[in-house]
Amino acid sequence: MSTFIKNWKRITLFQVKAIEENIDRLTSSFSSNGELVVFATAFGDVSIYNSSFKSLQSIKVEDESSIQQILWLDNKTFLLFSNVEGGTGTNSTVIIYAFSQADENEPPQFVLVTTHKFSINESPYPIIAVSQSPIDKTIACGFGGGLVSCYHGNPLRERGIKNSYSHNLGEPITGLTYLDDQSSVLFIATTNKTYSLSGKSLSCLDNTGVSLNCSSSCKTTPLQSREKNSSSFVCTRSSGLTFYDSKREKICFTFPGEKHYMTVMGSILALCYTPTLGTDSSTNEGLKKSFSSSSSIRKADASRNPAFPPRLLLVDLSRNLIVWEGHLKDVAVSILPLKHGFLVVTADDNVFELKRITLQEEISLLCQKMMYNLAISLAKKENMDIEFRESLMRDYASFLFRRGDFSASMDWYIRSIKSIDIPSVCLEFLKAQEIKQLIRLLEELIKTGLATSDHRLLLLSCYVEIHDSPSIRKLIDIGEIDFDQAFKICYDSNLLDEAKHLAIRFNNNERVLDVLVESEQYSEALRFFESLPPSNLLPLLLKYGRVLLDKLPEKTTNIFIQFYSNSHRGDLSTSESKGELKTAKSLRQTYLSLLPYAQVANFSLPPSLYEISPSQEENQRAALFSEDVSYTAPSPQTCFHIFLNHNSELISFLEGILPNASPNYKTLINTCLFEAYIRESFASSNVEKQEFWQEKSNSLLKKVEKNVDLNAVFLISQILGFDDGVRFVQGKSGQTLDIFRSFCQQNDIERALKMVRVHGPDQQELYIMMLNCFASLENVDSWYQDINEIVNIIVSQRLISPTQLLDILGKSVNIKLEHISDSMQSVLDNYRESISKQNEAIEMGKRDIEEITSQLSILRTRAFVVQESKCSTCGIDLELPMVHFRCGHSYHQRCVEDECIRCRWL
C-alpha cells in the first residue's frame, strides 16, 4: 500500500447537489449528527435543519450568548457551548445549554432542558473544540488561550455536571477529541505541539502543531496491519496526514499542500487544501519547515499563489481511494458530515451537498474501473445477496484471467465455486495450459463435495501430466472415481505403480497382477498372492499360475501348496516396489481426450523420467482379512493343468498338500502322484534316478494302497510300461498267485522273490510256493541265502510242519541239508525253547495252587482274635450288631454288605 495519497486510485463516488437555501452570515458554529444539522449564530440564534437542508426549528437561547461550539451527545440530545466575559473582566463564564428532543414527533422538536454555568479564572478566549469520552462521559472543552477544562456528570440534570479538572497548555488549542474505542485518552492539538491527556497525565506526542479545524477522530486507519475498527486521532499538516492510535503510536501518510479544513464521516475523510507550488522533494521539505508554526502559516497565507486554487478532496481511508476532488473559490469553507455525504458551506454562505451515489451505482462503477475486489468487499459489507456477490467474484476472476494473473483468477473462481460454470472454466485453463491452477479448482471441487467422476478423472490426468505421484495416490485413496478409465489413464501412461495402487484401492486383484506381470515383477506378484485372502485366490492362481511357474517355479509351487492345504491366510504387510517409470504420453493423445473438457484443448507438456517412492498398502484392505479366516480348499484337480510340463513342481505340490488333504481328495492325489513319479522316472536318462523314482512309486503304492485308484494305476502303468504297477494291481485284485506262477514258469526268480517280499505278508502261501520253486531249480548255488530266508519265515510263522518242510526240500537233488543246517537247527532250537517254557509255566501254576489251598485251610480251621473297637468304615465305636472278618477288619452291620470293604476277599 502506498503512503503517498496522491498515488491512490481515483473514482468518483460523490455527486454535487446544489442547495438553494443560504445560511445566516452571522453563523458562528454548526454541527451534524448525520440526520440533522444545527447552525448557531453569535447572537444566540439556533437553527435546526434536516439532511435535505429543510428548516425544522429555530431556537433563541437566553442572554443571546454567542454559541461557539455544538456537541451531539446522541441523536436526540445536543449541547451548546459559549464562553462570555465575566463581571471583573479577568475571568469568564462557560455556559452549557442542554437541548433534548421533546417527543417522538416528526419533524423532531428540541427544547432546552437545563443550563450550566462555570466561572473560569481566565480571559474569555473562545471555545475551539469540545468532545465527550465514551467511557465516563467526561466532556472536554479546549479554549483558544490553551486551557483544557473537563466536566463530569449528566448534563441533562440540573447541576448534573461539575468541573473536574483543568490543564493550561499555554498554547492556542486548535482541536481535541476522545477516540471511539473505549479509550479514556484525550488527544489535543495546538498550534505548536500535539498532546495526549490520560487522566491528569499529559504527554507530548509530536512537536509539530496543527492548524485550526485540521484534526479529528477517525474510526478507520488506512493500514492493513492495524486492528480492525481501531480509532485514531488524525491530524493534517502541510506534509500530509498523521494518525495517532490509543497506544500513542503514529502512522504518517504523505500528502503535500497547505491544509485548511478537515472532517471525517465513517471511513471518508474530507479535506480542503491548496496544492503546493512545487512537487520536488526539496520544495516539500521547505514546506514542512515553513508550516511548523502559526507565524509561518500566516506567511504562507500571505504568499498564496492564486494560480493554485483550493481544492476539496474526499478520501476513502478503508479502501485507499480518492473518491472525489473538486475546486473551491476560497479556502474559507466549512464541511459537515451527513449520513450519505457532506454539507459544504462556502465563504459566501452558500451551501451545496456532496451526496454519495447509491450502493448499486457504486458497485457498478467499481466494476467499470476494474476494482472488483473493492466491489466484492463492499457487497459483502452491505450483506448483499450471495448470488450477486458470487457474480462479482466470477467477473473478477474472468478479468484476472484475461490479464494473465491465473493464480489470482483461480483464487476467485474457488471462492465462487458453487456458482461457476465448471466445464467452461476448466476448458479455459486447459487452453491456457495452466495445469496447476486447474488442479487447484478440481481439488476444491472434491473438498466441497461438488466433484463428479469426470472431474476426478480430469484431476488424475492433470496429476499424471505433471508427474505428481503423491497426489495421484491421494486421489486414488479418496476413491469415487471411474476405475476402468482411471486405470487406463495410468496404465497407458506407463505409470504402472500408480495403476497397481489404483487396482489395490478398488480391490481389483486381477488388474494388480496384470500390472505386475506386465512389468515382469514376478516376485512382487507372488508377494501379492501371499497378501490376498483365500476367497480371492483361486481364479487368480488359475490365470497367472502357469506364467509364474515358468519364472519362479519353487515359490509359485509353495503358494499352490499353501492354498490347497488350507494353510493360506493372507498377509497385510506387503509393500509396493520401487520402479522407474517410462516417459509419459501426450496429455491430448492419451487421457484428456476421454474427458468432456478436452475437446478443444491442444497441448502437451514435455515428457520426463521420475521415480515413485515406496509406500504401504492402504488400510482399507484390512477389511478383507480376519485373524480366524476359515476356508475349504477346492479339489486339487482344478489346478493340475497349470503344472503341464512342470512335472517336478507337480510332485512337490502333491507331496506338499497330501498330509493336510481332505480324505475325499487323497485318492486323487495319490493316483496323480504315482503317475508323476513314473513320468519323472521315464523322463530321466540317469539309471540311478530312474530306479529312485520307480522305488518311490512302489513305496507309494504300498503306503497308500487303500487310498489309490487301482483302475487308474493299472491304466497308467500299462500306458507308461511300468510292470510293477501292473502286477501290484493284479495282486490287489486277487491275481497274485497267477502272477507268481508265471514268474516261476519263466524262472524269473528275482521278480518272484520281489513279489514274495511284497505280497508274502498278505498271502503266506507264497512263501511255500517260493520254497517249492527253489526245490525245482537245477542250480541253487546263488540262492542259498534267499532259501534260508524263506525257510526261516516258514519256520518262524509255522506255516507248515517240520515234516512237510523236509518233504519239500527232499524233492530237490541240489539242496543239501548242510546248506540249510542252520535253519533246521534254528527250527529245533525253537521247538526245544517252546517246550521248556511250557514246562516252566506248568510248574509255576502248580506252586500257586498249593499256596492258595494252604491259605484257605488256615482261614477255615483256625480262630482269630478281634481287637478292633471302632468301625473300619465310619470310625464310630462298634455296637451290636457288628460284623468281623478274618482279615482283622470289623464293621457295623449297617456299614458293610457281603465282603470286607477294604480287602475285598473271602
Swiss-Prot record:
InterPro entries: Clathrin_H-chain/VPS_repeat, VPS11, WD40/YVTN_repeat-like_dom_sf, WD40_repeat_dom_sf, Znf_RING. It is a peripheral membrane protein. Its main location: membrane. One of its GO terms (molecular function) is zinc ion binding. Pfam families: PEP5_VPS11_N, TPR_PEP5_VPS11, zf-C3H2C3. The keyword Cytoplasm applies. Its EC number is 2.3.2.27. One of its GO terms (cellular component) is HOPS complex. It comes from the Eukaryota. Keywords: Cytoplasm, Membrane, Metal-binding, Protein transport, Transferase, Transport, Ubl conjugation pathway, Vacuole, Zinc, Zinc-finger. It is an enzyme of class 2 (transferase). One of its GO terms (biological process) is vesicle docking involved in exocytosis. A zinc finger (RING-type) spans 871-906. It is found in: Vacuole membrane; Cytoplasm. CHCR repeats lie at residues 413-557. It catalyses: S-ubiquitinyl-[E2 ubiquitin-conjugating enzyme]-L-cysteine + [acceptor protein]-L-lysine = [E2 ubiquitin-conjugating enzyme]-L-cysteine + N(6)-ubiquitinyl-[acceptor protein]-L-lysine. Component of the homotypic vacuole fusion and vacuole protein sorting (HOPS) complex. Component of the class C core vacuole/endosome tethering (CORVET) complex. Required for vacuolar biogenesis and for trafficking of hydrolase precursors to the vacuole. Mediates transport at the vacuolar membrane where it may be responsible for tethering transport vesicles on the target membranes. Acts as a component of the HOPS complex that acts during the docking stage of vacuole fusion. HOPS is an effector for the vacuolar Rab GTPase ypt7 and is required for vacuolar SNARE complex assembly. It remains bound to SNARE complexes after vacuole fusion. Acts as a component of the CORVET complex that is required for transport between endosome and vacuole. Belongs to the VPS11 family. This is E3 ubiquitin-protein ligase pep5.
